Amino acid sequence: MFEQRVNSDVLTVSTVNSQDQVTQKPLRDSVKQALKNYFAQLNGQDVNDLYELVLAEVEQPLLDMVMQYTRGNQTRAALMMGINRGTLRKKLKKYGMN
C-alpha cells in the first residue's frame, strides 16, 4: 500500500510491513534503494542512458496521476507541474498518453 503525504514539500511512501505497521519514508529513499538493487544486478556491466531510464520510471506515473487529478486539463496539469503546456504535450506524446 502506497500513499503520498499531502501537507509536505517532501513526497513520502507509506508501506505496511508483515506486522501491519505503517512506516513512511521519503520517495527519494525508495528511489535510492531501487538504484542500489539495480546496480547490484549489473555485476559490473556497463550501463547507458541510466538517467533516461530513471526519468521514464518516475515521469510516466507522474504524468498519469497529474492528468487524472486535473481530469485531463492540460493547462492546469502544466501549471501544476511547473512546465509549459507545449512541453507537457510533448511528454504525453512520448509516453503514448495523448
Curated annotation (Swiss-Prot):
InterPro entries: Fis_DNA-bd, Homeodomain-like_sf, HTH_Fis, Trans_regulatory_Fis. Keywords: Activator, Cytoplasm, DNA-binding, Transcription, Transcription regulation. Residues 17-44 are annotated as: Required for the stimulation of HIN-mediated recombination. GO terms for cellular component: cytosol; invertasome; nucleoid; nucleosome; protein-DNA complex. The keyword Cell wall biogenesis/degradation does not apply. It comes from the Bacteria. One of its GO terms (molecular function) is sequence-specific DNA binding. NCBIfam families: PRK00430.1. This is DNA-binding protein Fis. The lineage of its organism: Bacteria, Pseudomonadati, Pseudomonadota, Gammaproteobacteria, Enterobacterales. The gene is fis.
